[in-house]
Structure formats: structure tokens, C-alpha cells
Amino acid sequence: MKKLKMKISTILILLLVFVTGCSSKKELKDGVYEGNYKDESATVKVVITIKDKKIVDCIREERDNKNNQIKDENYGKDDADFNYKQAQKAVKNSEGYAKKLVEVQDIEKVDSVSGATVSLKRFKSAVKDALNK
């Protein structure tokens, strides 16, 4: 019985150490970092400024890989009206991601906005690329 308790205790301690080690947040170093993410349909570039170990600014740019067009207020104008409206909904809904990152200081705490879920996945990947440099 003592051996079983000892094994269980050891496993629990190792599990606690592992979980604690995995949850520790990487300390940010001051500077300006650029990150990129590219998939078959879009490329995202972010420029993140760190000051006093905090994210103080984030600039995000997303481009359509088909025509290299920046996804802004003009994105989708050459398409049918429905496609333009859908494109603009995604653009509008994803605009807040950079601001939210500065606010919450953790990319995993930036929540998806309806109509811009794919943009968030791309943004998160670009941010992780920048912060891992």
C-alpha cells in the first residue's frame, strides 16, 4: 500500500511540475518585432512594439495572395456586391485584433469575432512568429 501511495504521489508531483512549467508565460524583451504568416489565400504581417516588457503597439496588415491586395476598405470592390459585403464584414471584424492584443497582452486571450475567424488564426500565427524571435 505504501508503494502505491508513493507512486501516486510521485506522479502527481511530476504532473504538477509539468503543468506549471507549461503555463509560465515567456517574458517579453523590449524592441520591435516583425512576424509573418502565409497560407494559400492570404499573408499576414504584424509589427509589434515591446516597451517595459509589455506590448505597447501592434500593427497588422493582411493581403490577399491572389492579387496582392491589402484587405482594407477597398478590398473586394471589384467583386460582386455580395462578395464585397462579405469581404468588408471580415475586414471590419478583424480590425480590432491588434488593439485587443495590446489590451490583453496575450495572444491566446484575443477572442474570435464572427466573420473573421480565419483572420484571427492567421493573426495569431503571425504574432507567435514575431514574439518567438
Tell me what each language-model feature is.
Residues 2-9:
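Bacterial N-terminal signal peptides that target proteins for export
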Residues 10-11, 24:
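Compositionally biased regions
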Residues 14-16:
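Cell-envelope/extracellular anchoring and linker segments
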Residues 18-21:
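C-terminal motif of bacterial Sec signal peptides marking the signal peptidase cleavage site
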Residues 26-28, 34-133:
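Active-site- and interface-proximal helix/loop "cap" or "latch" segments in soluble metabolic
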